[in-house]
Amino acid sequence: MPTVISPTVAPRTGAEPRSPGPVPHPAQGKTTEAGGGHPGGIYSAIISRNFPIIGVKEKTFEQLHKKCLEKKVLYLDPEFPPDETSLFYSQKFPIQFVWKRPPEICENPRFIIGGANRTDICQGDLGDCWLLAAIACLTLNERLLFRVIPHDQSFTENYAGIFHFQFWRYGDWVDVVIDDCLPTYNNQLVFTKSNHRNEFWSALLEKAYAKLHGSYEALKGGNTTEAMEDFTGGVTEFFEIKDAPSDMYKIMRKAIERGSLMGCSIDDGTNMTYGTSPSGLNMGELIARMVRNMDNSLLRDSDLDPRASDDRPSRTIVPVQYETRMACGLVKGHAYSVTGLEEALFKGEKVKLVRLRNPWGQVEWNGSWSDGWKDWSFVDKDEKARLQHQVTEDGEFWMSYDDFVYHFTKLEICNLTADALESDKLQTWTVSVNEGRWVRGCSAGGCRNFPDTFWTNPQYRLKLLEEDDDPDDSEVICSFLVALMQKNRRKDRKLGANLFTIGFAIYEVPKEMHGNKQHLQKDFFLYNASKARSKTYINMREVSQRFRLPPSEYVIVPSTYEPHQEGEFILRVFSEKRNLSEEAENTISVDRPVKKKKNKPIIFVSDRANSNKELGVDQEAEEGKDKTGPDKQGESPQPRPGHTDQESEEQQQFRNIFRQIAGDDMEICADELKNVLNTVVNKHKDLKTQGFTLESCRSMIALMDTDGSGRLNLQEFHHLWKKIKAWQKIFKHYDTDHSGTINSYEMRNAVNDAGFHLNSQLYDIITMRYADKHMNIDFDSFICCFVRLEGMFRAFHAFDKDGDGIIKLNVLEWLQLTMYA
């Protein structure tokens, strides 16, 4: 049994009308149906608190490889094991696959034979033609290819059953390590295979990509652009061919010259992802078809040599075909790679040609310029050689550009960025990357059709600082491209996640608000039209679009079409000239009284047990004036001269109630605080609250107690009550329906009105902590939140002696501060 060694997935180095109308119904792209889904991961600051205290650094591929060689074992990946868990998550497969390493499948296995090329990719029994079309495009650019497929991997020299591949994931390059066990049936690969039966780079690349997304099933159905971007870090543009610009062929030629990746498809009218099954076909039916396909395939051929050692083409399974094959040989609902563009002389005229490839490795176009076209005899021999014309069933074919435009409906071009490929021929673009999150009840506001919540979406300020360098353009214009990408939806499919329908809008910030990073409020969006926006909201992983706007300051608002949909995203802005893109509301502060107050140090409970080390003599004397009781002053508190006369009726009533409950020591515990607060609050019938809970009162004491006694005196309680009264007014202002609750989306404004200025992450955390399942916050939770904010800011400022916004705590101080809260 091979020894198991831990793997790694480690990072590598035009304006609308004045009154905006509703957003049109979202477009249905070639993607899965938009819907709810598992929420994205919470912020790293929260996740990291559950990490082991002593972290173990993940081993790199080199370390794992070296360890396997030293121990003379073959690597076995425990994170993506060779069993059913790595295959399908929705249903158990009815037949048993045998996981084999390439040396067990054939003699003389090779990683790459004669260079990786597009004919090395033949689709197996998985609906991932979108992925394979992208891989075929990748082979056209060797520098890109070997960024994804690192050099020096083989089945001979230093072979240890371990391989690795690199993918771009939301702004970072990650190294994915796998073992080389592959699923087989009758000694044949079930999924992607090469045209040569002893070549395995494409099968292993598919496995690494499946691991990245959790399983092979997760690769079923998708858009070519997803894989293109994961291979390059580029940004994709979509073209509806029927609405294509007149110079589309020129655009495609330029894309080929620049090393961009291109894919195309024909709509089948079902609004499904490429390679998925027709409506109503579930995973069980898909598996049943796969079984029938295998049983009827050439795999049952008794003459098949299970350990063929030559490099002859492998005998492949015809893929499970859900796509609709047309009479012309093209397939609807299927992804093709665009592998070349040329102009050929035919009967004295130049004809524009497009070369395409079907990832099945078979089933080709049978019209003009196809492999078997009868009029090839009229094409010059040198021209044939230049076009590499040969009659072979390899899935690749030429067709005229006119036929291409007539039959195909969508074109996808993945443009490379500086992150993926450096070239002197390409213009340098400035790239800004922002990560964000839509949180239900706080920042998942939906599109402009939902004005009450649209303004709560994350907002990103964009400063276009310099105009384009275009001597032929008299306009003062900045060119830029915005790309919004949702994260982890494919990986979370097994948890019920689907792609959301997403889009964005761009608004110009008024000059008087330039430099102000505050979150723009609802009224701004009610009375200002957007300057630009995505063409449509669509359920795809990424939506992108080019814009040309004058230099100014703008705000980009990314959103889902429907509100309350929770997920993570990244927002990328590419511009020809310098720009600055950052999230609005990124400063944290609290409004402080103008009058300076004496800086009292924070007193920990343990400090009082240790001779009050943090208290000076002056502080103790001052405390003695405030705190009363036999153990502090030895006598009952005496009112100051004229104090009673100055007290209002409410204050007198307040003091009397407090005295009745607190007793002679004039201090109250959590139970007594609960009685005091609820006695007073119950008189305010308009609040419609059930009062404060005991746990809430314990938190109030912990956060308002200035000396660590675990109790509140009259002065401390009076300070608390003044705050509660002020916060009560804010609560009533936002409780517009007098239900005793406020909508969690309004909490941002309420917190701001109370003088606390937070960033988006903190507003998200407040919503998760205090809102109920209906996204409402009751009076008790509302006050608890504000008490906690007040106490936390007060504690921080007490430690921040030099006012630089940074404090240093030892572990005892940290535990005391957080435990007693």
Swiss-Prot record:
GO terms for molecular function: calcium ion binding; calcium-dependent cysteine-type endopeptidase activity; catalytic activity; enzyme binding; ligase regulator activity; molecular adaptor activity; peptidase activity; signaling receptor binding. The active site is at 129, 334, 358. Activated by micromolar concentrations of calcium and inhibited by calpastatin. Pfam families: Calpain_III, Calpain_u2, CAPN13-like_C_EFh, EF-hand_8, Peptidase_C2. SMART domains: calpain_III (SM00720), CysPc (SM00230), EFh (SM00054). Residues 1-37, 603-651 are annotated as: Disordered. The keyword Ribonucleoprotein does not apply. The keyword Hydrolase applies. Ca(2+) 2 binds at residues 705, 707, 709, 711, 716. Residues 622-634 have a biased composition (Basic and acidic residues). One of its GO terms (biological process) is negative regulation of protein sumoylation. Skeletal muscle. Ca(2+) 3 binds at residues 735, 737, 739, 741, 746. It catalyses: Broad endopeptidase activity. Its EC number is 3.4.22.54. This is Calpain-3. It comes from Rattus norvegicus.
